[in-house]
Amino acid sequence: MKEIAVLGSTGSIGTQTMDVIRLHSDLFHASVIAAHKSIDKLREQAAEFHPHAIVITDEEAGKKFLEIYDGDADVLIGEAALSEVVKRDDV
């Protein structure tokens, strides 16, 4: 299975990418999903796709996400987290 990092998973291209991953879940797994502020959509995606890590680049949105998220993925906040998360072995 190919592990995929979807940066901007809540945007137009990102949601289309998530659709492809959904259709081909035997081939792909969204191991990392990332968004700037769309934490409600990100929480929905996390519940469906069970990523290993979630990145929210906006600091305030990240704090709010931590209040509403009850999953077990690593949650990283801030722009620098994007460059760190793509270096993971599970991507």
Q: For the regions a protein language model found, what residue spans apply to each?
A:
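Short, ordered loop/turn segments at secondary-structure junctions
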Residues: 11, 38, 59-60, 80
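N-terminal Rossmann-like dinucleotide-binding module
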Residues: 1-54
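A conserved hydrophobic position in a structured secondary element of the catalytic/binding core
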Residues: 8, 57, 77
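Short, charged/polar "capping" segments at the starts of alpha-helices
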Residues: 40-42, 60-65
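A structured beta-alpha segment of the ubiquitous adenosine-cofactor-binding alpha/beta core
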Residues: 66-91
